[in-house]
Amino acid sequence: MVCEGKRLASCPCFFLLTAKFYWILTMMQRTHSQEYAHSIRVDGDIILGGLFPVHAKGERGVPCGELKKEKGIHRLEAMLYAIDQINKDPDLLSNITLGVRILDTCSRDTYALEQSLTFVQALIEKDASDVKCANGDPPIFTKPDKISGVIGAAASSVSIMVANILRLFKIPQISYASTAPELSDNTRYDFFSRVVPPDSYQAQAMVDIVTALGWNYVSTLASEGNYGESGVEAFTQISREIGGVCIAQSQKIPREPRPGEFEKIIKRLLETPNARAVIMFANEDDIRRILEAAKKLNQSGHFLWIGSDSWGSKIAPVYQQEEIAEGAVTILPKRASIDGFDRYFRSRTLANNRRNVWFAEFWEENFGCKLGSHGKRNSHIKKCTGLERIARDSSYEQEGKVQFVIDAVYSMAYALHNMHKERCPGYIGLCPRMVTIDGKELLGYIRAVNFNGSAGTPVTFNENGDAPGRYDIFQYQINNKSTEYKIIGHWTNQLHLKVEDMQWANREHTHPASVCSLPCKPGERKKTVKGVPCCWHCERCEGYNYQVDELSCELCPLDQRPNINRTGCQRIPIIKLEWHSPWAVVPVFIAILGIIATTFVIVTFVRYNDTPIVRASGRELSYVLLTGIFLCYSITFLMIAAPDTIICSFRRIFLGLGMCFSYAALLTKTNRIHRIFEQGKKSVTAPKFISPASQLVITFSLISVQLLGVFVWFVVDPPHTIIDYGEQRTLDPENARGVLKCDISDLSLICSLGYSILLMVTCTVYAIKTRGVPETFNEAKPIGFTMYTTCIIWLAFIPIFFGTAQSAEKMYIQTTTLTVSMSLSASVSLGMLYMPKVYIIIFHPEQNVQKRKRSFKAVVTAATMQSKLIQKGNDRPNGEVKSELCESLETNTSSTKTTYISYSNHSI
């Protein structure tokens, strides 16, 4: 009958439903058979909707095309199977029967939108007061099924279209195959959930694979459309966020490619030859044609394909392209074959499966026969007997999404079960509170479900309604002319990849590279190319720098140097002057000889202490001088010994003390001679402080100044050891060494020796002043020669010591120079002042006798005559004065102090 509608009551999407108003009314006026001609209806207490691509897209003007046996029939039968299992389960929705209303989307989003309006009919309030039929009777409306939730759809484009309608009526939707990332937008698709992971997870898995294989320079290839472009976009975004992967170029395959288009794409990919890895989000046909083009251009083994789930483990894309596809890594959502469904589906016949309105069509397609009035009218097709059996008389393999269809139905069932437990506690069947199910409330229960699915894996949803990502990773391998997709790993929020099981072209197990630049060697940093972070030049970390990370070098701490590969720092070896070193052997040898000689002289002097020569040399000051000489030799051992606090303390004390002893004694001697002869020129009165006791007091007073300075040094800067890393910090870190030494700077050393050098210089001045003393009284001349030689030694010491401050051998040179200089100074004093005396004492004892006893008056007379004859002496060689000067002196027997004079070795 014909009816004219004037008004439709208000609803949440009035502006949208107005356009469909007449279509809905037409649908509602159909007879029962007409209404369900393209749907499956199973009655129940709670009705679930289902959307499946039973047919493919039709040609222009025709909404539906050929039957899709696997993606259509297998999947909708999986929903019916799940409904049967739930209704038989006494522990799940007990005494509540689930019914279904399954529609065909015909793989077209617009057609699916029209079909899905059936699900919202019961939620649209109708005002029929102004609606009249042609005969004036009120219209009769068929009561539509009230849909509580929808299972589907398959294609993302269909799910997007349907989700926009269902959300307006608050009908929860669970998809079993839609993977578009945009469906994760909970603000736009808040009532949409899915038991399959979104392509963003797949993209994440592919990024992880690329990273695990060390590929940082890749190209992307997408089929034009939502699936390909969204997948590549997700891959690009994730790779940009985590860093480390650069996109060399992104190519798109047009929906309607021109001839030669695929060859052009391959040539463009070859423009960046280092980007061998190609990320593919493309449909099956595009994958096949890309492989054909690569084969045509003879690029076997060059490209490293990373395929999405549209490639998966399919044979069709690689058929007759095996060599070009070898090594391809593909990804596929983890799934399992459900044995219970296999038994169920194989048992389906025309007799026991009348609820499936498309099963007769499937039967004809599957067995290649015709069914009477429903059969195909082609005469050459055999007639169906009805005795055919699935898997026996036809090939059968469970479709890959069957598991997810079952899990989607069970997710809805568990949500309803939990809702019933809370809203109808203890109530058998539906309670009044669940007669009308609040879709928003049901959505909350759906998002909260957590159960083991049909394959034994957990089924859960996140806050966006997405299922966790679980993927199997395959590699296409060729072994002994046989091919296979071998599982090489899996991905469940993180990658587990068996790299050792991977095989590449030419049966190699070492995975090839897809990088813009080769990795830098250890100890080299990356200097990235501007704008291309995956391309770089390698620069070596020089000097004492080590590689901190890929991009930077840093200076090692002062006490460390780079290790052999410059990836870290290691302690610099600590060295000290060893006893066996040539730098130590020479000064030690000299010191030992000097100590032996000094000891021999001391023993000789002690043994012959009362002989004229020993007495005439000034015994008291001689022993002080010999002590200083002994200390000068001994300091060598302290300077070479391993430094510690005690050794450093002794070094400070004895470093200048030996020289101070020596030169204080010599200075006192030369000063005494000078004062005596100067006084003798003026008067016959003896100068003050020329007695032995006075001489000792003067000497030790001079020495005490040195000791006082050392004491102040101890207080201001207590002795301790240091490790000097700057002394031997060579240009080559391998030769760098830390020097263990006492904390005595060059300045401190000069200050310590400075006082002794001052005494030495003063003594030299007095030696020069007394150089003209008559030979009878002249011990001043040997002292003078001693001081001249000593000055030369120390003048040579200064440039050698300070000129090696920047040398890597500084410690050795300075220590050896200092110890040898002190030993040579001591040797000069010992050799010139005491060896002649010892020689006479040992080998010429007849000369070690008292010749004359002279008074100070004799000295005065000698001094006076010496001053008178000095000018005459200037006319003689070397200013010598005749020895008869001494013979004219008369003996004075007064009580004044006398001096013993040896004509061979005079001393005062």
From Swiss-Prot:
Tissue specificity remark: Prominent expression in olfactory bulb, pontine gray, lateral reticular nucleus of the thalamus, and piriform cortex. Less abundant expression incerebral cortex, hippocampus, cerebellum, and mammillary body.
Record's bilayer topology term: Multi-pass membrane protein
Cell compartments where the protein resides: Cell membrane
Gene Ontology CC annotation, any one: GABA-ergic synapse
Spans through the membrane: 584-608, 621-641, 648-668, 696-716, 747-768, 782-803, 819-843
CDD domains for the chain: 7tmC_mGluR8, PBP1_mGluR_groupIII
Disulfide bond annotation, renumbered to this chain: 64-106, 246-534, 369-384, 424-431, 516-535, 520-538, 541-553, 556-569
GO terms under biological process: adenylate cyclase-inhibiting G protein-coupled glutamate receptor signaling pathway; adenylate cyclase-inhibiting G protein-coupled receptor signaling pathway; chemical synaptic transmission; detection of mechanical stimulus involved in sensory perception of pain; G protein-coupled glutamate receptor signaling pathway; presynaptic modulation of chemical synaptic transmission; regulation of neurotransmitter secretion; regulation of synaptic transmission, glutamatergic
Glycan attachment sites: 95, 298, 452, 480, 565
Superkingdom assignment: Eukaryota
Keywords per UniProt: Cell membrane, Disulfide bond, G-protein coupled receptor, Glycoprotein, Isopeptide bond, Membrane, Receptor, Sensory transduction, Signal, Transducer, Transmembrane, Transmembrane helix, Ubl conjugation
Extracellular side: 34-583, 642-647, 717-746, 804-818
InterPro entries reported for this sequence: ANF_lig-bd_rcpt, GPCR_3, GPCR_3_9-Cys_dom, GPCR_3_9-Cys_sf, GPCR_3_C, GPCR_3_CS, GPCR_3_mGluR8, GPCR_3_mtglu_rcpt
Family classification: Belongs to the G-protein coupled receptor 3 family.
Subunit structure: Interacts with PICK1.
Protein name in UniProt: Metabotropic glutamate receptor 8
Provenance organism: Rattus norvegicus
